[in-house]
Amino acid sequence: MTDTNCSVGIVAAQDAAFDIPLPLASGAALPGYQLRFETYGKLNADKSNAILICHALSGHHHVAGYYRADDKTPGWWDNMIGPGKPIDTRRFFVVGVNNLGGCHGSTGPSSVNPATGQPWGSAFPVMTVPDWVTSQARLADRLGIERWAAVIGGSLGGMQALHWSIAYPERVAHALVIASAPKLSAQNIAFNDVARQAILTDPDFCGGDFYQQGTIPRRGLRLARMLGHITYLSDDGMGEKFGRMLRSGEYRFGYDVEFEIESYLRYQGDKFSDYFDANTYLLMTKALDYFDPAAAHGGDLAAALKPAQAAFMVASFTSDWRFSPERSRETVKALIAAGKRVSYAEIESVHGHDAFLMTDQPYVDLMRAYLDRVAKEVNA
């Protein structure tokens, strides 16, 4: 039996169907679509206490709580969301949504294309962060939420929070941008391309139309996840957890798994290939690559952020080399140059990029203090 005392408890996903086409940055348009989402807590009378949680690459709408009493795995940010937690559901109404192109209930490549009666597959349009934010705004309209008390996201989710503040300035009171960046570096784009190539060159990928073939490009997904997972960890963190430990205690002088880190990465790859969609992985990494709000302003990030009205909290982690503190400081400097209100914290952690999902005490304390301020502003 799952202990839900400090949790939002048993939750259920909801679906919102939209019949109006969604124009996309690519020039394409997505016809009728569905967004899957979850909510926790209660919306107050003036609907001022709503918080939107934006997920990262492999995330989804199931942010907190459990689906069944015997469920062993809570939502991916359950350590932050719930009664008495930093994002306190006794004070806030929290919304988590699976982005379009995802594989957890919202319309994506594995969904049926109404024009063909077959899965979208390779025909599903490329999505961008602005496309997601537009769809999230439509969901907010559906829920009757005119203004978010806060939009919060880590990594790719932080990019969405940043874009919310630019695209809908009057609808965001606070934007929390965690372990993120205003655009990807060349190195990060390179990592994403290698991961995509692992999938694209898997014979079972079938050009993205593997659903009809009854295959799953597991080899490509495994390799993509293994590569990605390495970049989410830090050298010190990996050394502390695995070092050079051998599974059998001695060298076997072969090419099978010998080191514990090899076993761990293969386990992560195998697990990921069991539930994640290959086309979704491609879409999510491309959305990361394309995000660059400063591009439309001649590379001037401060100019891109000028429309924002929100107060910002930007946080980074010392051991995160995928989205380094330098990238967060770049955002902070641009916000200051644009005359915005911004708080910045660089948190000591050995957990690398994944630290935004962890519970390092300084991080928890930071989130609790900032969200307490947000709650007081809306009398929550």
From Swiss-Prot:
The keyword Hydrolase does not apply. Substrate binds at residues 225, 354. One of its GO terms (biological process) is methionine biosynthetic process. It catalyses: L-homoserine + succinyl-CoA = O-succinyl-L-homoserine + CoA. Keywords: Acyltransferase, Amino-acid biosynthesis, Cytoplasm, Methionine biosynthesis, Transferase. It comes from the Bacteria. It is found in: Cytoplasm. Transfers a succinyl group from succinyl-CoA to L-homoserine, forming succinyl-L-homoserine. PANTHER family: HOMOSERINE O-ACETYLTRANSFERASE. HAMAP family: MetX_acyltransf. NCBIfam families: homoserO_Ac_trn, PRK00175.1. This is Homoserine O-succinyltransferase. The lineage of its organism: Bacteria, Pseudomonadati, Pseudomonadota, Betaproteobacteria, Neisseriales. The gene is metXS.
